[in-house]
Design a protein with these regions (language model features):
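Short, well-ordered alpha-helical
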Residues: 2-106, 136-138
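Short glycine/serine-rich loop/turn segments
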Residues: 80-210
Length: 210
């Protein structure tokens, strides 16, 4: 049995996990530790799903700070207090590079959050890392493969490693399906959320603009 199995954290929905953290049944630190362990076992090694481009080096520190704040005031926090969230790597995050999967942007540290990331943080979410994608959220050529990027390699379908994970928000869908986080952000112009969500048997939601 793997080390994360007994945690019973990685199979929970965001709502369930937020409720457990608020009620003191889990800590944010325990949730983050379990998910980082699972990423190391299944994304970096094992089947090497390659859904994650980078993890947040500050995640454990942030999780401990959240736990300490909630111990001092149990009523503290938003709807996602302490819940780990993954973000597609074409969405800016202040503490991690935003590469869009391209080697040209591996050092693209903007030092700021996209509006949607700032709103997640204000709701208490913990940004766990950045997910792989079809490079530039599109195909580089007519022979391009969904879910491949120069930075992250080919995102692999956890249900069948020989099948496509869809794209372009491949890493976000695979990461949720594999239990690396209960929720992840994607982007979509034409099918980039719904395609990988369908391939993973997940709900993919693209809100209307305006």
């Amino acid at each position: 049995m793997t080390s994360w199995a007994s945690e019973n954290v990685t199979t929970k929905t965001a709502t369930e996990l937020a409720g457990d953290i608020k009620a003191g049944r889990f800590t944010a630190e325990r949730a983050v530790r379990a998910m980082l362990t699972r990423i190391n076992e299944l994304d970096r090694s094992g089947p090497q799903l390659q859904s994650i481009i980078t993890t947040n080096g500050q995640a454990m520190t942030v999780a401990r700070a959240i736990d300490e704040a909630m111990q001092a005031d149990p009523n503290l926090g938003g709807l996602l207090q302490g819940v780990p969230v993954l973000v597609k790597d074409n969405i800016e995050t202040r503490e991690m590079p935003t590469t869009a999967g391209s080697l040209a942007l591996v050092d693209n540290n903007t030092g700021r959050d996209a509006t949607i990331v700032a709103r997640l943080r204000s709701a208490g979410a913990l940004i766990l890392g950045k997910t792989n994608l079809s490079e530039w959220a599109n195909y580089r050529s007519q022979n391009g493969v969904a879910g491949w990027s120069g930075v992250g390699g080919l995102t692999r379908n956890p249900f069948d490693l020989n099948r496509s994970a869809g794209g372009s928000s491949s890493g976000s869908a695979v990461a949720v399906a594999a239990g690396f986080a209960p929720v992840a952000l994607g982007t979509e112009t034409s099918g980039s959320i719904v395609s990988p969500a369908a391939a993973m048997g997940l709900v993919g939601f693209k809100p209307t603009v305006g």
